[in-house]
Regions:
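Glycine/charged-rich beta-loop-alpha catalytic/anionic-binding loops adjacent to active sites
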Residues: 36-43, 61-68, 391-406, 473-476
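Active-site diphosphate/adenylate-binding microenvironment
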Residues: 5-15, 26, 31-36, 340-415, ...
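Active-site nucleophile and cofactor-binding loops and adjacent substrate-binding regions
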Residues: 23-25, 44-54, 69-75, 131-133, ...
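Catalytic phosphate/nucleotide-handling subdomain of diverse soluble enzymes
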Residues: 416-456
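A general structural motif
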Residues: 48, 108-109, 181-193, 252-255, ...
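N-terminal alpha/beta PP-like core and its mobile active-site loop of ThDP/TPP-dependent enzymes
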Residues: 1-329, 367, 371-374, 454-457, ...
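Phosphate/pyrophosphate-binding active-site segments
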Residues: 134, 157, 169-170, 181, ...
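Thiamine diphosphate
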Residues: 112, 450-543
């Protein structure tokens, strides 16, 4: 007779799950022993449970199916929380198995006791306690169903002793748990209202988010009919940037002036599958149509004139026959011309200054992009690495870009890379890591060596919390508390038995990355980059300009004029502040 843990593994395998990320603990012994006995199911051990949740999120994003992580009772599953928040806000299906103290001890302030159902409620679509062995199969299936249908995190809390209980055969879990296919589009009245607005507008701009996944061709046809430039949010980049003659770049804090301008000049803004959060980048006077699969998102970020509930693919397909071709393509042509100028200016910043040190981070990202494989998976840390990835890593329909783009947590690049590489050890995975982010979960470099994961880690080593410093400058504050006294990360990698290099001169960068990418195991390339590089947003507000002026004055008064000189030398001399 199988145990509860045996049933869990069998159901997961039947539903296409191949591994669980986690760290062993006594309350998980029944589960890990079942994995050992199964023989054909993976246990991906990491060095911190937070990494287990990040890795599961990356696997779910990459495979498009359920991924699983586990944590032992108390502190073990508490460590999962940050990674689970990331998965929940990225809308990827993750099952978290949170082991619990013995059921008889609940409520007694027992060793390592917490209240997992309360703790995980905010970062999940489903969170329930298994109170009896007989209840386990049903709760497991309900949790898996919630995760795959709602694209979110489901948490099953299991007292450790329940894993080892024998279980009679049950119909629960007898069939694979996979997402159901469906068609979702607005009704005819909504479609006709949208068509009327679009047909009467002169200047239409499309803002595309992650919801355009799987709808690339439909959106291209729509843009052609409407003569509409396409601006993308960061999460839409990998799905819409490639093979796109209507692309005018990103908007937002990380975006391009051309994307910002195309939105500001629109009569109608058509939002497709995006929950873009920054209100200051929306147009003041345009009519706005929003298409989203989640009704709660409609009108959440900016007032809208029309909300349409449906998938982007289904909605656009139904809308196209109602639209008239636009003969006036001047808005599109102006936007594309501006984009070409913006793109040329950005590319000029990524040129190789062979004698200038520290190295420009733009150049690092551009070289990594050029040398990486056509189907590479890029994972990026929150902070300045996201800026450089957004601007210089190009998508082609085969590459992937994974990061904490909604939750915004540091230290995600390496754990996400672990999850991505675990799915396919032959696919190139490149982690663009900040020095601060890498240091937070530095022990996971050991996971790369122990699990034989050939992840390539590129460290943007500017010896600071760089993006935090930029925010301080914009607020008119003298940098404080952002200094990082870093080691030679390449030497540390070598000491751990990995390929390690440190690059301090631009002339050495390409050779180091080429060697690292060709290496058959994990590799770390520590690149010393310019600390004072400014990732200027597409539009600077009066308040931000005032902030930079105050920063300059206060920096001089604080006796740190050398910092200001570096800032001016690196940025003003290169004409990116005008």
């Amino acid at each position: 007779m199988a145990t509860v843990a045996d049933h869990v593994i069998a159901v997961l395998k039947r539903s296409g799950v191949q591994r669980i990320f986690g760290i062993p603990g006594d309350s998980l012994n029944g589960l890990t022993d079942a994995i050992r006995r199964a023989g054909d199911f993976g246990w991906e051990q990491v060095r911190h449970e937070e990494t287990a949740a990040f890795a599961a999120a990356a696997e779910a994003a990459l495979r498009g199916g359920l991924a699983v992580c586990a944590g032992s009772c108390g502190p073990g599953n508490l460590h999962l929380i940050n990674g689970l928040f990331d998965a929940q806000r990225s809308r990827v299906p993750v099952l978290a198995i949170a082991a619990h103290i013995p059921l008889a001890e609940v409520g007694s302030d027992y060793f390592q006791e917490t209240h997992p159902q309360n703790l995980f409620r905010e970062c999940s679509v489903y969170c329930e306690l298994v109170s009896t062995p007989e209840q386990a199969p049903r709760i497991l299936e309900l949790a898996m169903r919630a995760a795959v249908e709602e694209n979110g995190v489901a948490v099953v809390v299991v007292p450790g002793e329940i894993f080892g209980h024998r279980l009679d055969e049950t119909a629960w879990g007898a069939r694979p748990v996979r997402p159901t296919g469906s068609v979702c589009r607005p009704d005819e009245q909504g479609l006709r209202a949208a068509a009327a607005m679009l047909n009467s507008a002169a200047n239409i701009t499309i803002l595309a988010g992650a919801g355009v996944a799987g709808a690339h061709d439909q959106v291209m046809e729509l843009a052609h009919i409407l003569a509409a430039p396409i601006v993308h949010a960061l999460r839409g980049k990998e799905y819409i940037e490639y093979d796109n003659p209507y692309d005018v770049g990103m908007t937002g804090l990380l975006g391009f002036a051309s994307g910002y301008k195309a939105i500001r000049e629109a009569d109608v803004l058509l939002m497709l599958g995006t929950d873009f959060p920054y209100q200051q980048f929306y147009p003041d006077r345009a009519q706005i149509i929003q298409v989203d699969i989640r009704g709660r998102n409609l009108g959440r970020r900016t007032p809208i004139d029309l909300g349409l509930l449906g998938t982007v693919a289904d909605t656009v397909t139904a809308l196209q026959p109602l639209l008239a071709n636009k003969n006036d393509r001047s808005h599109l042509e102006r936007s594309l011309k501006h984009y070409r100028k913006t793109r040329q200016r950005l590319d000029s910043l990524a040129s190789n200054d062979r004698d200038r040190t520290p190295i420009r981070p733009e150049y690092v990202a551009a070289v990594a992009n050029r040398l990486a494989s056509d189907d590479a998976v890029f994972t990026v840390d929150v902070g300045s690495p996201v800026v450089w990835a957004a601007r210089y890593v190009t998508m082609n329909g085969r590459r992937r870009l994974i990061g904490s783009f909604n939750h915004g947590t540091m230290a995600c690049a390496l754990p996400h890379a672990i999850g991505a590489q675990s799915v396919d050890r032959k696919r190139q995975v490149v982690a663009l890591a900040g020095d601060g982010g890498l240091a937070m979960l530095f022990g996971e470099l050991l996971t790369l060596t122990q699990n034989r994961l050939p992840v390539k880690v590129i460290v943007f080593n500017n010896s600071s919390l760089n993006f935090v410093e930029l925010e301080m400058k914009a607020a008119g504050i003298v940098n404080f508390g952002t200094e990082l006294d870093n080691p030679d990360f390449g030497a540390v990698a070598t000491a751990l038995g990995m390929f390690g290099r440190r690059v301090e001169h631009p002339a050495d960068l390409e050779a180091a990355l080429t060697e690292a990418f060709a290496h058959d195991g994990p590799a770390v390339v520590d690149v010393v980059t310019a600390r004072q590089e400014l990732s200027i947003p597409p539009a600077i507000t009066a308040e931000q300009a005032k902030g930079f002026s105050l920063y300059a004055i206060r920096t001089i008064l604080a006796g740190r004029s050398d910092e200001l000189l570096d800032l001016v030398t690196i940025n003003v001399a290169r004409r990116i502040l005008n």
